[in-house]
From Swiss-Prot:
Function, in words: Catalyzes the attachment of proline to tRNA(Pro) in a two-step reaction: proline is first activated by ATP to form Pro-AMP and then transferred to the acceptor end of tRNA(Pro). As ProRS can inadvertently accommodate and process non-cognate amino acids such as alanine and cysteine, to avoid such errors it has two additional distinct editing activities against alanine. One activity is designated as 'pretransfer' editing and involves the tRNA(Pro)-independent hydrolysis of activated Ala-AMP.
Protein name: Proline--tRNA ligase
Family: Belongs to the class-II aminoacyl-tRNA synthetase family. ProS type 1 subfamily.
Catalytic activity: tRNA(Pro) + L-proline + ATP = L-prolyl-tRNA(Pro) + AMP + diphosphate
HAMAP family (alphabetical): Pro_tRNA_synth_type1
One GO biological process term: prolyl-tRNA aminoacylation
Keyword Protein biosynthesis: yes
Alphabetical list of InterPro entries matching this protein: aa-tRNA-synt_IIb, aa-tRNA-synth_II, aa-tRNA-synth_II/BPL/LPL, Anticodon-bd, Anticodon-bd_dom_sf, Pro-tRNA-ligase_IIa, Pro-tRNA-synth_IIa_bac-type, Pro-tRNA-Synthase_IIa_type1
EC number of the protein: 6.1.1.15
Keywords: Aminoacyl-tRNA synthetase, ATP-binding, Cytoplasm, Ligase, Nucleotide-binding, Protein biosynthesis
Written domain comment of the UniProt record: Consists of three domains: the N-terminal catalytic domain, the editing domain and the C-terminal anticodon-binding domain.
Superkingdom field: Bacteria
Record note on quaternary structure: Homodimer.
Length: 569
């Protein structure tokens, strides 16, 4: 591609509304342009990168024998009403009506559509298992879209769906797709982790997220330093501590704590550490109006874990102070588990405390030297807390460390959630109708582009991994407009590299060298070749890698093979 015939528009200044590096650099390099809130046009340069991502994904999906199709973006409300998600998906579902007042949504995902297709197309176990994927535009009506294409309202996603009759078959396909995702991100040159994850609104029995590691990532990931264990903050657990192995010999004592309401205030007032206290949170229950969740004072409640307990209502709902005071006759800052006449669920780490300080269920009073069993009863012990850096890994191997990541892929074992709701069944080997079970496998095409930039950039611009770069090589002829020799040699080099299937940009614009070099660094082309009269007199071409500040001279007759070898490494 010749730059003089290409739409190459870069910006020196960083846009004011761009918060993170990928958003800034995608705008400055001319990859994207904003149309509206969370809506972006992919300009020619950005589209080249996007297509490379799609091609890698498509190749690896095809290797798993998944079949590509394309489903409508606009979906009828009836399908979503069958599964109940029309009401439960929330405000991110963009709904509309046609001229006949029929309701539709712009699909944020396609479980309902693919299940509807398969319940009509599949009749027999002989047709299973099957796996279909698409690369399609989605829309989620984010309240506050931000970070450019990282959290846009409209985005492109690869979503795949598999159908099975047995759990073993589902697990086999799940493993194949998991490995395909690993190959995809390996080919893209990304540093990532596959982590255990919550199934969230999609549902299902098991799931893994693929997280690109980046300091700007919104997700917290915990991983063991001595094993393969890794999970996001919602799912991460630590080694369960043993119960206190010795009884508390101190007498439980009621003390005054005037106007001390928070854990930190109580601990400071009593001259103790917060990890010597426990806190009691009152939430809505499934079968009971209220349920108490008890944690060690220095721990944070993991709301996702809490809602998985059979006694806790989902979504999690905290009881307001007025209702607590009216029902339990205790102000919020003085609640504790002793003689609390509602179900009490205790976190394992709180249960491991031989003694503790807790609210006395009287205004401005706390108990010290309280102990489980002797003083406080509970209904169940459960994992309720967010793990912390330094906790022991749940597999007993190593300690947990924390890093940040950007979720770019998510695979789920859905089970029969959607097939059962939509009566998607086939005749099994015994001649009976059997509900199918499903797997779901999503990958954010547009988000991968932004995540790659977050991981690969410097103060000058993008540093593309070779597989994603819009161009692999940039040839810059210096004074090519005035020197016929430079112009001809640059053209010859351009044609030779093209003939070997290499993506080459010939930057033949009539600009100063500094502008051409700065644009190359901003755009992030991995390999730069500079053709100049001075170097040609020595029979050389100047080479510079985007990852290095050093330049080197390559013999003219060796430069093509030199580039080919670099690209094929």
């Amino acid at each position: 591609m010749r730059a003089s015939q290409w739409f190459l528009v870069t910006q020196k200044e960083t846009p004011n509304d761009a918060e993170i590096a990928s958003h800034q650099l995608m705008l400055r390099s001319g990859m994207i342009r904003k149309l509206g809130s969370g809506l972006y046009t992919w300009m020619p340069l950005g589209l080249r990168v996007l297509r490379k991502v799609e091609n890698i994904v498509r190749e690896e999906m095809n290797k798993t024998h998944a079949m590509e199709l394309l489903m409508p973006s606009v979906q009828p409300a009836e399908l979503w009403q069958e599964t109940g998600r029309w009401e439960t998906f929330g405000g991110q579902l963009l709904t509309m009506k046609d001229s006949n007042q029929r309701e539709y949504c712009f699909g944020p995902t396609h479980e309902e559509v693919i299940t509807d297709i398969m319940r009509n197309e599949l009749q027999s176990y002989k047709q299973l298992p099957v796996n279909f994927y698409q690369i399609q535009t989605k829309f989620r009506d984010e309240i506050r879209p931000r970070f450019g294409v990282m959290r846009a309202r409209e985005f492109i996603m690869k979503d795949a769906y598999s159908f099975h009759l047995s759990l073993e078959s589902l697990q086999e396909t799940y493993k194949d797709m998991y490995q395909a995702y690993c190959r995809i991100f390996d080919r893209m040159g990304l540093k990532y982790r596959a982590v255990e994850a919550d199934t969230g609104a999609i549902g299902g029995s098991a799931s893994h997220e693929f997280q690109v590691l980046a300091e700007s990532g919104e997700d917290l990931i915990f991983y063991s330093d001595a094993s393969d264990y890794a999970a996001n903050i919602e799912q991460a657990t630590s080694l369960k501590p043993p119960k206190a192995n010795q009884a508390c010999n101190e007498t439980i004592t009621l003390v005054d704590t005037p106007n001390q309401k928070t854990i930190d205030e109580v601990a400071s007032f009593l001259g103790i550490a917060s990890n010597q206290t426990i806190k009691t949170l009152i939430v809505k229950g499934k079968e009971h109006p209220m349920v108490a969740l008890v944690l060690r004072g220095d721990d944070e409640l993991n709301e996702v874990k809490a809602t998985k307990h059979p006694l806790v209502h989902s979504p999690l709902s905290f009881i307001d102070e007025e209702l607590i005071l009216k029902t339990l006759k205790t102000p919020l800052g003085s609640i504790g588990p002793i003689q609390l006449n509602i179900p009490v669920i205790v976190d394992h780490h709180a249960l491991a405390m031989p003694s503790f300080v807790c609210g006395a269920n009287q205004a401005d009073k706390h108990f010290i030297n309280a102990a489980w069993e002797r003083d406080a009863k509970y209904d169940d012990a459960y994992d309720l807390r967010n793990v912390k850096e330094g906790d022991q890994s749940p597999d007993g191997r190593g300690t947990l460390h924390c890093c940040r990541g950007i979720e770019v892929g998510h695979v789920f074992q859905l089970g029969d959630k959607y097939a059962k709701a939509m009566n998607a069944s086939v005749i099994n080997e015994q001649g009976q109708l059997q509900t199918m079970i499903m797997g779901c496998y999503g990958l954010g095409i547009t988000r991968v582009v932004a995540a790659a930039i977050e991981q690969h950039h410097d103060e000058h611009g993008i540093i593309w991994p070779q597989a994603l770069a819009p161009f692999q090589v940039n040839i810059i002829p210096l004074n090519g407009a005035r020197s016929q020799t430079v112009k001809e040699q640059a053209e010859s080099l351009y044609q030779q590299l093209k003939s070997h299937g290499i993506d080459v940009l010939l930057d033949d614009r009539n600009e100063r060298a500094g502008v051409l070099f700065a644009d190359n660094d901003l755009i992030g082309i991995p390999h730069r070749l500079v053709v100049s009269e001075r170097n040609l007199e020595q029979g050389c071409i100047e080479y510079k890698s985007r990852t290095s500040s050093e330049t080197q001279l390559i013999n003219l007759d060796k430069v093509v093979n030199f580039i080919i070898e670099l690209i094929n490494k």
